[in-house]
Amino acid sequence: MMLHVPEVLTRDQVADIRTRLDATDWVDGRATVGPQGAQVKQNRQLPELSPVGRELGETILKALLVHPLFVSAALPLRTVPPLFNRYEGGEHYGLHIDGAVRSVPGTHLRLRTDLSSTLFLSDPDDYDGGELVVVDTYGTHEVKLPAGDLILYPSTSLHRVEPVTRGTRVCSFFWTQSMVRDDGQRHLLFELDQDIQKLREKLGDCPEVLSLTGHYHNLLRQWAEV
């Protein structure tokens, strides 16, 4: 399931993050990938242990955990601290797939990458090119969202970033291990949860809504790994 999650950050939060990012030092993005990724990656990133990056990442994680759409879709168990990248002057990232397991920088923890997220910190009018292109079983999808919005997609998807030919594209990106490993099961739970919320708005907590809520939690109880 691929999902647009709007307004993860407010405009003021985006502006503050961009101000701080623009004042810090960036490194060659190839330093954070293996030999295969390094052949197709051309961008800059904040160092994984950057104090500024860690602080800004905490701001993003706090916003995610109170965003009902993200929580409903991802059912997050653990999330790698958000990283930050920057593309300009023709920089790009060729077709690749994310690694199945990620280490949490500065710790001995590892997590399974079920879901990948890109949080846009530049508006579409600020740059040309730079589309995130995701290839899945349903086709090829080009993504270019307003600053503060996020795209969530399965980490099993091939994807690339098109060359940025004008301006600067700044994003945060990270991976989440879901409580529900299987994408199909997670999609079913998401749609059921969204329908329950809509029915509750119309009908309140009537017996049928309570029954559906019970079915949701029983399915989650059956499939969740915590």
UniProtKB/Swiss-Prot annotation:
Names of the cofactor(s): Fe(2+); L-ascorbate
GO annotation, biological process: DNA damage response; intracellular iron ion homeostasis
Residue ranges annotated for the Fe2OG dioxygenase domain, each copy included: 78-178
InterPro entries, per database record: Oxoglu/Fe-dep_dioxygenase_dom, PKHD_C, PKHD_hydroxylase, Pro_4_hyd_alph, Pro_4_hyd_alph_FE2OG_OXY
Top-level taxon in the UniProt lineage: Bacteria
SMART domains: P4Hc
Entry note: cofactor: Binds 1 Fe(2+) ion per subunit.
Gene3D superfamilies: q2cbj1_9rhob like domain, Rabenosyn, Rab binding domain
Record key words, sorted: Dioxygenase, Iron, Metal-binding, Oxidoreductase, Vitamin C
Residues that coordinate or bind 2-oxoglutarate: R169
EC id: 1.14.11.-
UniProt enzyme class: oxidoreductase
Pfam family, one: PKHD_C
Binding site for Fe cation: H96, D98, H159
Record SUPFAM superfamilies: Clavaminate synthase-like
GO molecular function terms listed in the Swiss-Prot or TrEMBL record: 2-oxoglutarate-dependent dioxygenase activity; iron ion binding; L-ascorbic acid binding
Listed NCBIfam families: PRK05467.1-2 (NF003973), PRK05467.1-3 (NF003974), PRK05467.1-4 (NF003975)
PANTHER family assigned to the protein according to its UniProt record, in alphabetical order: PKHD-TYPE HYDROXYLASE YBIX (PTHR41536:SF1)
Protein's name according to its UniProt entry: PKHD-type hydroxylase Mpe_A3725
